C-alpha cells in the first residue's frame, strides 16, 4: 500500500510539473495561487494624491486653516517581471465630469440623439508626455515612480518663502517630494514631464489649435471629478497633433468621421454646451481610474473595460478639509498582489498619503 501511495504522489508531482510541488505534495503554484498582480502585463496607477494637504496660522490666539494643493502626485507601479519604459507614454485626464448630470449628444441639436463615442474611445481633456527615445526611463519590476506637480520639499520651500513669519504657521502636514524623479512643473524634479495638450475652456474648432499651444493651454491638474489614464500611444504625439489640427478644419458635417478631433456637445436640464476634445483608442489605455466623490457619481464616463467603478477621498464636495486633507486613493493589496479588476470602487481605498516610492503592502 505504501508503495502505491508513494507512486501516486510522485506521479501527481510530475503532472503538475511547472507549477512546482512541495515536499509534502502540496502544489506551490498553479491556478489556485494566481494573484491579480501576476495577471497584469503593464504599468499600473498605484496611488493618486490630488486633494492636497493643509497648513494653519495662529493669529491673535485663533487658528486659521488653509488648503495646499501644490503637492499633488501620481504614483505608477510595475507589477510585472520585466522592465517597463515610460518613454513616449501619456498621462491623460478625461474631458467629462462623472458627477455632472448631463447627456452627451451627437450634434448641437437638442433632439440629435445620445452619443457614445466617449465610451468607445478615451476622450482626452489634457495630457502629459514622458520624454525619451524608448529606453531612457525604465521602471524596474516591483518598483514605483512618482510624477509630482512640484518635486520639492513643500514644507521647507514654504517655510523659506514665509521667512521670519514662519513662527506663527503650522506646516507639519506639508509633504516632502524632493526625491520624486518626475515633475509636470518645469524647473522642479530631475525630469520634466511636460504638458502637450489641454482643451480646457476651448469651445470651438476655430480655437482648437490653442489646445496644443503652451502659451495658451491651462496648467495640467488633477481634480476630484475626472478620469485619469496611463496611455501607451501607437502613433507619435507629433503625428496625432498634425492629424488633429487638420481634422478641426474639416466642414462640420465631416468632423464626425475624424480620428482624433471631436466637437463635444452635451446638454443638461437647463442648457446645452460645447467643447473641444481629443479621442484616443481605448486599447491604448493601459490603466485608468475615475475619480469622484463617493456619493456624487451620476455618469459613466469610461468604457466598462477600463473602469467599472470610481473612487475618491471625499464623500461629497462639501466635506470639511480635515476629513480628506493628506489622503490619497491607493490600490488595495490583497495579500498576494495589488488588486486590479478594472473597478476602482473595489480596487482602491483611501489611505494616508505615502510620498515615497517605498511599496507598502498591507
Could you tell me what each predicted segment is?
Residues 80-81, 150-154, 234-236, 282-285, ...:
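Acidic glycine-/aspartate-rich tracts in secreted/extracellular proteins
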Residues 1-8:
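Bacterial N-terminal signal peptides that target proteins for export
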Residues 43, 72, 87-89, 143-145, ...:
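Residue-level detector of short, conserved catalytic/binding motifs and their immediate flanks
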Residues 17-20:
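C-terminal motif of bacterial Sec signal peptides marking the signal peptidase cleavage site
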Residues 101-157:
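Intrinsically disordered, low-complexity Pro/Gly/Ser/Thr-rich segments with frequent PxxP/GP/PP motifs
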Residues 165-317, 324:
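Acidic, glycine-rich loop-and-strand cores that form catalytic or ligand-binding grooves
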Residues 301-362:
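Extracellular low-complexity, O-glycosylation-prone Ser/Thr/Pro/Gly-rich "stalks"
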Residues 23-100, 198-272, 333-335:
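A structural motif detector for short, solvent-exposed N-terminal "entry" segments of globular domains
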Amino acid at each position: 500500500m505504501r508503495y502505491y501511495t508513494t507512486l501516486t504522489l510522485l506521479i501527481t508531482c510530475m503532472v503538475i510539473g511547472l507549477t512546482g510541488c512541495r515536499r509534502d505534495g502540496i502544489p506551490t503554484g498553479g491556478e489556485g495561487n494566481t494573484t491579480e498582480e501576476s495577471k497584469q502585463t503593464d504599468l499600473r496607477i498605484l496611488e493618486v494624491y490630488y486633494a492636497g494637504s493643509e497648513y494653519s496660522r495662529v493669529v491673535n490666539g485663533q487658528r486659521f486653516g488653509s488648503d495646499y494643493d501644490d503637492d499633488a502626485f501620481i504614483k505608477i507601479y510595475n507589477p510585472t517581471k520585466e522592465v517597463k519604459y515610460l518613454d513616449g507614454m501619456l498621462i491623460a485626464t478625461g474631458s467629462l465630469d462623472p458627477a455632472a448630470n448631463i447627456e452627451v449628444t451627437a450634434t448641437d441639436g437638442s433632439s440629435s440623439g445620445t452619443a457614445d463615442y466617449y465610451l468607445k474611445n478615451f476622450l482626452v481633456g489634457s495630457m502629459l508626455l514622458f520624454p525619451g527615445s524608448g529606453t531612457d526611463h525604465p521602471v524596474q519590476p516591483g518598483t514605483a515612480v512618482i510624477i509630482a506637480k512640484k518635486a520639492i520639499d513643500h514644507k521647507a520651500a514654504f517655510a523659506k518663502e514665509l521667512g521670519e513669519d514662519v513662527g506663527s504657521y503650522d506646516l507639519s502636514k506639508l509633504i516632502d517630494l524632493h526625491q520624486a524623479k518626475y515633475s509636470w512643473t518645469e524647473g522642479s524634479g530631475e525630469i520634466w514631464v511636460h504638458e502637450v495638450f489641454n482643451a480646457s475652456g476651448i469651445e470651438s474648432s476655430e480655437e482648437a489649435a490653442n489646445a496644443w499651444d503652451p502659451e495658451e493651454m491651462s496648467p495640467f491638474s488633477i481634480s476630484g471629478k475626472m478620469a485619469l489614464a496611463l496611455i501607451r500611444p501607437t502613433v507619435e504625439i507629433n503625428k496625432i497633433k498634425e492629424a488633429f489640427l487638420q481634422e478641426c478644419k474639416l466642414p462640420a458635417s465631416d468632423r464626425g468621421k475624424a480620428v482624433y478631433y471631436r466637437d463635444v456637445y452635451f446638454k443638461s436640464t437647463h442648457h446645452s454646451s460645447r467643447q473641444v476634445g481629443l479621442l484616443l483608442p481605448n486599447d491604448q489605455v493601459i490603466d485608468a481610474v475615475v475619480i469622484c466623490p463617493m456619493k456624487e457619481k451620476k455618469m459613466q464616463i469610461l468604457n466598462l473595460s477600463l473602469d467599472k467603478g470610481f473612487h475618491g477621498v471625499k464623500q461629497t464636495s462639501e466635506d470639511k478639509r480635515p476629513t480628506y486633507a493628506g489622503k490619497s486613493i491607493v490600490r488595495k493589496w490583497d495579500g498576494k498582489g495589488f488588486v486590479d479588476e478594472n473597478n476602482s470602487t473595489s480596487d482602491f481605498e483611501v489611505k494616508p498619503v505615502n510620498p515615497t516610492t517605498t511599496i507598502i503592502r498591507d
